[in-house]
Structure formats: structure tokens, C-alpha cells
Swiss-Prot record:
Belongs to the anthranilate phosphoribosyltransferase family. Mg(2+) 1 binds at residues 94, 228. It comes from Pseudomonas fluorescens (strain SBW25). It comes from the Bacteria. One of its GO terms (molecular function) is anthranilate phosphoribosyltransferase activity. PANTHER family: ANTHRANILATE PHOSPHORIBOSYLTRANSFERASE. Mg(2+) 2 binds at residues 227-228. This is Anthranilate phosphoribosyltransferase. Anthranilate 2 binds at residue 168. Its EC number is 2.4.2.18. Anthranilate 1 binds at residues 82, 113. One of its GO terms (biological process) is L-tryptophan biosynthetic process. Gene3D superfamilies: Nucleoside phosphorylase/phosphoribosyltransferase catalytic domain, Transferase, Pyrimidine Nucleoside Phosphorylase, Chain C.
Amino acid sequence: MDIKTALSRIVGHLDLSTAEMSDVMREIMTGQCTDAQIGAFMMAMRMKSESIDEIVGAVSVMRELADKVELKTLDGVVDVVGTGGDGANIFNVSTASSFVVAAAGCTVAKHGNRAVSGKSGSADLLEAAGIYLNLTPVQVARCIDNVGIGFMFAQSHHGAMKHAAGPRKDLGLRTLFNMLGPLTNPAGVKHQVVGVFSQALCRPLAEVLQRMGSKHVLVVHSKDGLDEFSLAAPTFVAELKNDQITEYWVEPEDLGMKSQSLHGLAVESPAASLELIRDALGRRKTENGQKAAEMIVLNAGAALYAADHAYSLKEGVALAHDALHTGLAREKLEELGAFTAVFKMENEG
């Protein structure tokens, strides 16, 4: 099916099949569509609302066209990732949590990009920390093997997305493409914590990942609007485990944490986010640093559970607390910077 035929269907509020959506996405991502067609398609899909079949079709093509990272095993390898777009502008919780997860002895294949709507995307933060981003898939795999954590810069692995970049920027609205990043990890991880910008997306995206072969995933959105677990409000979870999806709410107190406001955790730049994270992963000299540490522990604990490194969310949080307080997470951050510096010299001379 071509994009013109698809548009006429979607405008009539008819869903596309998985195969039809795959045809259209392949057409878009191989440069066969005009910007006007892509923009119209994205808006029509948004107005109709994307079906699970359509998201699966889009994800399948993005995964097919990605520059993949080949790992020795995917057992227990986890990604902590969010769609962004929650408007909260708090520090990079998922990225900071990834280093705690690695410090706890779990392997992390982190996928991320620059900020779209917020002040600091994961790539912006890591660049501020001196971590070299423009790695080949083989170099990313070496980071993961040697450091226990590696970062896959989305634009380096999903080059075909460039064809939709102009229309996405011109529209300036959330579209199907905002959902695709967390669902298209180039290493093909089967364990994830996926934060989303709307509770309504939790169950559908869990179903998409179920169909794509994921093993243990938590798709989350907090009642105060975050695309991650919150210290300040209950968090809604759609959990995929043993090929079953269950939905539930989690309070911080359920996991041995104390509820508290997020005041002081918003940042205006990657540098400010990095400063807060370094304090949280280090000696926690400030009140905000201590609060940030607890937010990191909460989300790292969820990742350890999703990776099957812990038997429950509560045990995951306890393991994350211990890992953060050893100081190893901050060491992992510095270690990744040093390791990627070698690749920078190799790649740039």
C-alpha cells in the first residue's frame, strides 16, 4: 500500500493492517515520500489514533532498517527509556538510573537522543559529561562488554528517520514517531522500563512489545504526569512478564520510599542536570541532590526488576539503593567517558 492510498483510508477513520503500515513506513523511510505527504500522514494518524497493529508495523520497519548492535547475549540486558514530552523538565532520571543499574551488576544497553521538547535529552547530558556519542555499533558493543553500559545515539542508528525529520520539526506536535524511539532499541533488548507521556499509552505499548517478543517490560506513567516513576505521586504500570500483561498502581511507600515533592529537580540545561546527577551519585551534599538520588533509586530499582535481577520492584529498589551508596554508579559514569575517549581518537584522529 502506498502513502496516498493509506491517507485516504486513515482520513476515513479506517485502520491499516500491520503489513499495510509496514509498506507505508518503508516508503517514508527510504525517501520515496514528499514532506507534505509525511506531514499529512502523521497528522491523520494522530487524529484517528494509532492502532496496535499500526504501531507494530511501524516498529518492525524501524528495527529492520536500524544499524544494529550485536551483543553476545540479551539475557538480563536492560534499557531505561522514555518518550519524553512530559513537560516537567526534571533532570535526566532514566539516564542517571542506568548507571546505578550498571553499578548493581546488570548490563545496560541505553538508547536515547537529544531533547525534543525538554531542556536536556540523554544525549545532551552524556555529551556534557564528556562521553563521546558518535560510536559505531561495534564500539557500542565493546562499551557494553567492558563497562557494563553503552549508549546508542538514536540518530546514529536510525539514519532512515532523517526523511521524517523535517515534517516532524515543522509540525511541532507529538506524533507516532514520538512513540517509536523507546520501541526500537538497536540492540534488540527484551527487558525495559519504558516511560510514556500519557497513561493511555501504557497498555497499548505493552501489547506492542509483547508482539515484538519482549520478555519483561514495565510501561509507566505517573499521576503527576512524568514518563517515569515519581516520588510525588502514584505511578501507573502496565507490566509484561511471562507473556502476560498486568496493570496496577504503585505508591513510593509500597517500595520502601518516602513520598515527597519534586521541587528542586527541574533543570534548565544539560550542565545543570549533570551537576545535580553528580551530586546525587556522589556525596549528596545538597537537599536536592539527596532527593534526586531517591528518584534515581526508584527508577533504577524498576529497571533491576525488569531485567530479572530482582524478584520484585521492592527488592529492586533496595538493590539500587545499595548500588548508589557504594559510589560505583558515579565511577561507571566516568569510566564510560574514558572508554569512549579512546574511540573518539580512533574515529577522529
